[in-house]
Amino acid sequence: HTAKDFHNQSVNPPVVRASTIIFKSMQHIRKTQVKAKKNPTGGHYDYGRQGTSTTYILQKILTKLEESYHVFTTPTGFGSVFLAIFSVVRPGDEIIAADPVYSPTRILTQDFLKQFNIKTIFYNPSDLKTLEKNITKKTKLIFVENPGSNTFDFQDLGKIILIAKKNKLLTAIDNTWGTPYY
């Protein structure tokens, strides 16, 4: 029911593909940019990389389906992994990640983040005591894949989240191989 497009009288909203957004004047662009700053999730676009009305409607639908405050969509799954990690960590911070992880995620966390003085510690997903032992004052995030990319092993998310809450840490879960039910 969220996707109804009463303006165009269609059952589902039309798919809008655009990289360039057209405006009537520079003044109109500036007004849109001011609105976007005040409400970044409000569907105000001045360039295609910010999304279109289609992505905005998708976010609204997913927000309702997932019963969340907001959903942010990215063009790729790995883009969302990158965004989730980079929105949390800063130089000097640490991440604890389940091993094994998706190869590009390993390269990001093990190699790329080093350049920013961000350390990643990998733990055996079947040994949550090791996870707890590796938490330090610098730890900001526990990163989990469920099921695991290479092994398809399932981790005890309930216990991991309890550990995270106890230590006031955020968790990020890559659910690529799962479904909304995992």
Locations of regions flagged by a protein language model:
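Short conserved active-site loop signatures built around small residues
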Residues: 1-16
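Alpha-helix initiation/capping motif
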Residues: 6-8, 47, 51, 124
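Residues at alpha-helix termini
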Residues: 8, 65-66, 116, 167
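Pocket-edge structural micro-motifs
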Residues: 17-21, 49
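Conserved N-terminal alpha-helix of the aminotransferase class I/II PLP-enzyme fold
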Residues: 25-79, 107-111
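Conserved PLP-enzyme active-site core in the AAT-like
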Residues: 71-182
